[in-house]
Amino acid sequence: MTQSYSNTLTIPTLIENEELLPFYMTPEAAGADVKAYLKESLEIPPGQSALIPTGMRLAIPEGYEIQVRPRSGLALKHQVTVLNTPGTIDADYRGEIKIILINHGTNAFIVEPGMRIAQLVLAQVLRANFVLSEELESTQRGVGGFGHTG
C-alpha cells in the first residue's frame, strides 16, 4: 500500500547549488540524502576523518531538530560513516551544515563532488525539565548497566 506524506514541514534552505538540495530517494524514506559540496575530490585515509561541507544552511523551526545519520551503503561497502551519529542540528543554528565522515576501512575513501554522504532526519524536540531529587523510584533493572543482560 502506497502512502503519501501530507504532513510535511517546510525548511527554508540557502544553498550554493540547487542540485545539492536534500532529497528523499523513496516515497517512504525517513531520511533525506545530503550531498558533498566540493570543488574537487577529497581523500579520507584509513582511520582518519574529514569535515565535509554541504554548501547548505537551514532555518529549522523552533521545536524541531535535524539529525545527521549515516548512509547504510557507505557503511557496508566502504566502512565509512558519520563520526558523531546521530549529529544534531539545532533550530537556532544558521551556519553551513558540515558532515564529519570517518573511514573505518583499510583503503582510502574518495569523497566526490556531489556524492551522497549522509541523511538528514527531521525530529520534534521535547525538552526535559531536570529536577533535583533525594531518591529515584526503584525498577526491576536497578543499576544494571553495560552488558548486564549478557
From Swiss-Prot:
List of residues binding substrate: R71, S72, G73, N84, T88, I89, D90, K98
A Gene Ontology molecular function term of the record: dUTP diphosphatase activity
Catalytic activity: dUTP + H2O = dUMP + diphosphate + H(+)
Top-rank lineage group of the source organism: Bacteria
Name of a matching Pfam family: dUTPase
Gene Ontology biological process terms in this record: dUMP biosynthetic process; dUTP catabolic process
Gene3D superfamilies: 2.70.40.10
Assigned EC number: 3.6.1.23
Pathway: Pyrimidine metabolism; dUMP biosynthesis; dUMP from dCTP (dUTP route): step 2/2
Cofactor(s) required for function per UniProt: Mg(2+)
Keyword Oxidoreductase attached: no
Family: Belongs to the dUTPase family.
Summary of the function given for this chain in its UniProt record: This enzyme is involved in nucleotide metabolism: it produces dUMP, the immediate precursor of thymidine nucleotides and it decreases the intracellular concentration of dUTP so that uracil cannot be incorporated into DNA.
Protein name, as recorded: Deoxyuridine 5'-triphosphate nucleotidohydrolase
Upper lineage: Bacteria, Pseudomonadati, Chlamydiota, Chlamydiia, Parachlamydiales
